[in-house]
Amino acid sequence: EVKPNYDYLKPITLIHTNNVLEAMKVTIEKRKKELESPRSLCLFINRTDMILQVIEKLGLKKDSVVFCSSNSTTKLNEAGIKAVENWNIKEQKPFMFFTSRFYAALDIELKVQPDIMFVTEPYLYEYTIIDPCTDAVQAIGRFRNGVSSTTHIVSTNKDFPIRDEKGINEYIKASEEAYNTILRLYDCAPSLEFRNAYKAALDQLPFK
C-alpha cells in the first residue's frame, strides 16, 4: 500500500442530497451571486448521459464544453453541445465538464483558479461515484495553478454494496476474469453480429 509522506488534504464542501440536479442548480446560482470576478466551474461527472441532462435542464448549453472520449463527442455535438476529445485552453468556457479519462495524467493550467464540482449519483449512474482517496485527489491535482474551491454533490444509495479490502480485491479479480472471457469470445466471433453482441457486453463491464 502506497501512503504519501506529506499532507495532501484539501477542503471540500460536501452536499448530501436526494435531488442531485436541484442541488446543482441551487449551488450554481449561489456561486453566480457570490462570484466577484469570472472564473470557470469545472465539473467532474463520469457519465456523458448525465452531463447531457445537466446541461440541457440547467440551460448551460452555450456556456459549456465537455471533455470526453471520442466515442461520446459525436453524440454530444449532435445534441448541440460543444464536446472535444483533448484538453485545450482555447476551448475554455464558464462551465467545463470532464469524464474520468481526465482525472489523471493531464496538466490543466488556467490563469484564474477554477472552482471544482464533483457529482455522484449512484441511483441512476453508478459509475459517477467518486473515490475521495483517489479520484478526487487526482482530479484536483490536474490544476497546476491550484483551485479556488471544491464541492462534492452526492446522493447515496442504501442498497449499494459495501465491501472490505478482501471483497474489493475479489470483485476486481472476478471483473477482470469476466472481461477477459468475453474478450476471447469477441476475438473469435464467427460473424459481425456476434462481435457486436460481445462488444456491447464488454462496454457494460466495470473492468476495462
Predicted features, each with a name:
Residues 123-149:
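Conserved SF2 helicase motif VI
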Residues 46-49, 65-83, 99-103:
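Conserved helicase motor
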Residues 168-208:
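The feature captures the C-terminal accessory region of ATP-dependent helicases
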Residues 1-31:
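Interdomain hinge/linker at the junction between the two RecA-like core domains of SF2 helicases
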Residues 94-116, 136-146:
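SF2 helicase motor core recognition
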Residues 40, 91-96:
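Loop/turn-to-beta-strand initiation segments
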Residues 1-2, 155-157:
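Conserved helicase ATPase motor motifs in RecA-like P-loop NTPase domains
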Residues 24-59:
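Conserved strand-helix element at the start of the C-terminal RecA-like helicase core
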